[in-house]
Amino acid sequence: MEAALEVASNLRPEDRREVEEGHGTNPLGYLIREARRGTCVYFTMPNGKTAGMAGIEDEGVVWMLCTPAIHDYPITFAREAKRFIDSRQEELLWNIVDERNTVHLKLLKFLGFKFLRRIIHGPNKLSFIEFARVQRKRSKRSC
């Protein structure tokens, strides 16, 4: 719960704008709800700052909200995010992202997501990009 409060009160402006303008949702309420569900993780950087939270909702809907701390250790953050995504068992991970959120677009590309199409979404009818990643099947090794 503490991480949810920290992330919500320190969101990157682009992330706050995406949640509020694009989805019509209060970031604090959303993060607290997800923290209570227990379906999320948070990322802490070497300087002790919380860089963000991420989670997987029903049907493989993946989400992430970040603080400016991601810019302090961008490589560390990207590797931690990749570890999280690669650890997931869902066959398909997907969602939409505000096309103005260029940092997240770059991260999604690094994480192996493919951009599918532009859609108009939310109360302000903003342009979002649908993205998805089909998880690689892990082969079982035998002796």
Go through each PLM region and give its residues.
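C-terminal "cap" of GNAT-fold acetyltransferases
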Residues: 121-143
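Conserved beta-strand-loop-alpha-helix junction that forms the acyl-donor binding cleft
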Residues: 93-109, 120-124
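Conserved beta-strand in the GNAT
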Residues: 42, 46-63
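Charged interaction scaffolds used for protein-protein
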Residues: 37, 45-46, 59, 137-143
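Conserved acyl-CoA
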Residues: 79-93, 102, 111-113
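Short amphipathic alpha-helix that is part of the acyltransferase structural core
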Residues: 1-25
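A short, internal acetyl-CoA/4′-phosphopantetheine-binding micro-motif in the GNAT/acyltransferase core
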Residues: 63-79
